[in-house]
Each structure stands twice: as C-alpha cells, then as structure tokens.
Swiss-Prot record:
The keyword Cytoplasm applies. NCBIfam families: efp (TIGR00038), PRK00529.1 (NF001810). This is Elongation factor P. It comes from Rhodococcus erythropolis (strain PR4 / NBRC 100887). CDD domains: S1_EF-P_repeat_1 (cd04470), S1_EF-P_repeat_2 (cd05794). The gene is efp.
Amino acid sequence: MASTSDFKNGLVLQIEGQLWTIIEFQHVKPGKGPAFVRTKLKNVLSGKVVDKTFNAGVKVETATVDRRDMTYLYHDGSDYIFMDGDTYDQVSISESTVGDQSRFLLENMAVQVATHEDVPLFVELPVTVELVVKHTDPGLQGDRSTGGTKPATLETGAEINVPLFINTGDKLKVDSRDGNYLGRVNS
C-alpha cells in the first residue's frame, strides 16, 4: 500500500485488478476544499492512458514489478526468446507483450523485461539504439518538398524517416520509444 504522497513516475499501482503505471502526477491544493492528486495512468497490458484523480492521503494498492536485465536471442514463430544474464534461463515472450518494441529489436541486444508474479508485462529497450540502414533511395539535392526527409528501411525491417543525406549502409542512432532519427553514428 502506498499513500498519494508516495507517488512517483513509474510506480505501478493495482487498481480494480489491473496494473497501471504512473506517467505523471501533480499534487493540487486548491484555495478552497481538500487537496488532491491528479494523475495520468497507463495500463501496463493494454497501453491505454487515462486521467484519474485521488484525494490526498488515500492509500492505493501497489504492485511489485521486477525488472530483469535480459538479452534478446531470437524470434521463434509468434514468440521472442530472451535469456536472463544471471541464471541463463531462456524466457519465451509473446509478440503481443513485446509490442512495437520489436521494430528495433536486434539479436544479442540487452533489454529490460518487467514481470509481475513471473508473468512478463512488457519489454523495455534502451532509449537509443544503433541500427544500419538496409535500403533508402538516394537523396536528390534541392528536393525539399517533403521537408527534407525520406523513408529508410533499417536492418530490423522498421521504416523511419531520415534526412536526405543518409545513404544505404549508414549506421544511425534511433529513439526506440518513438522511432525518430537522432543522428549518424561515427564508426
């Protein structure tokens, strides 16, 4: 159990049998009336985001979420296979649990797997990943009608928009949360 004064970003709450993580929160003390805490919660399993208000001082059930460092090994049908670096146990995680993170998942990549009661909840990649451009059309100088970007296919199969000067074979730094191009990697 945690009080509203214990709220922090990333805390996982158990509300009505479902797991919710706090994205952001704000303590509000109006001039008239009792204080309250306004939160933005994200459902751990479905990804749904909702706004919820708690009265100040209310106790809320918290969930124990273990985050383990694991290594992604390979994709097997509809499952992704990860290995725990400490115990060398292999864990099979479904495509639905991995979600969009699979777009930037490379073999032997270090990731964090969050579990609750030994059930995998989600996979967290590093914030930035370095990937090689598998294919992109050559950029033409003066072609600025699209804002100076063009589509590029990465080695994982993900497609992102990159500046016109990027060529096939370049190594890029990509934000794994939203798929934005961050820069070239000097090798």
